[in-house]
Every structure is written in structure tokens, then in C-alpha cells.
Amino acid sequence: MPLALEGKKAIVAEVSEAAQDALSVVVADSRGVAVSAMTELRKQARENGVQVRVVRNTLARRALEGTPWECLNETFSGPTLLAFSYEHPGAAARLFKEFAKNEKDFEVKALAYEGEFIPASELDRLATLPTRDEAIAKLMSVMKEASAGKLVRTLAALRDQKQEEAA
């Protein structure tokens, strides 16, 4: 069913606004995926701070003009599902990666992060980014290990000094 011009303008404005605030964007093709599975994907997306949207290709191209995501324009062919990550740059990629494991018809076309085009073959590059909490936990463990190592070296130096004094 054709959209009226005002409806198209509204869609372009909504998608453009969503793109301005996004940390990353993932483009996928959901042909052949059951409606119930797509509903579950949308639910999981909302829980993870990801906006999922099906947009006509010409409207998507117009909406992404002048944004860092313009590099994705070449991937808009066939049904296009856009996912905008707002809380964590890898959230949409991680979500789509997990979803694609269970849905053989679901295909990630491409993604973009900080204006850089990333082909679908490199999905893991973004999907494996640690979350903020994971990054803090890793940093804390490294700092904890470093301080323990420093203590061991200090005790070893103290032991060596005592042995030299005794000799």
C-alpha cells in the first residue's frame, strides 16, 4: 500500500532522529522469519536499548543522509531491518548474532560503528565488545592482579635485602 507524502516524511524524520542518537547500526534481512520470532526479537531489543525498525530502502537512504551511517546505503536492497543501538555499541550486533543462530533465514547484511562500514562477515568485531560493566570488571581484575604482583615483588626485595644483611 503506497504511503502518502506526509507519511513518508514522518518516517524519514523518525529514522533520521533515531540515527542521530545511535552508537551503532546493524542492517539485516528478515525474509522467511516467523512473526512470533520477530516479535520476540523486538521484545529483546527493547530490553537491550536497541530500536528495531523495518524501513523502505529509499526512505532509509534519505533518513541516513548526512549521518555517520550513510556508509550503509549500498546494503539497502530487498527487505531492510534497521537496528539502532543506544546504550552499548555492540548491543544490536550481539542480539542479531544470537537471533541468527536460531533463525536460519535471518541474515545480517552489514553494520556500522562510528561511521565505519563493517561487513556482515565481521559481525563478531562489534558483537564481542564488552559491556561497560564487563570492561570495568576486567579493569578491576587487572588492577587487583597488578597490586598483588607489586606486593610479591616488594616482599621478595625485602627478603633479598634481609638475606644480604644476614650474610
Swiss-Prot record:
Keyword set includes Ribosomal protein: yes
Cellular component terms (Gene Ontology): ribonucleoprotein complex; ribosome
Entry keyword set: Ribonucleoprotein, Ribosomal protein, RNA-binding, rRNA-binding
GO biological process: translation
Any one GO molecular-function label of the UniProt entry: large ribosomal subunit rRNA binding
Pfam families for the chain: Ribosomal_L10 (PF00466)
Record's subunit section: Part of the ribosomal stalk of the 50S ribosomal subunit. The N-terminus interacts with L11 and the large rRNA to form the base of the stalk. The C-terminus forms an elongated spine to which L12 dimers bind in a sequential fashion forming a multimeric L10(L12)X complex.
Function, in words: Forms part of the ribosomal stalk, playing a central role in the interaction of the ribosome with GTP-bound translation factors.
Family: Belongs to the universal ribosomal protein uL10 family.
Full protein name: Large ribosomal subunit protein uL10
Organism expressing this protein natively: Chromohalobacter salexigens (strain ATCC BAA-138 / DSM 3043 / CIP 106854 / NCIMB 13768 / 1H11)
Encoding gene, per UniProt annotation: rplJ
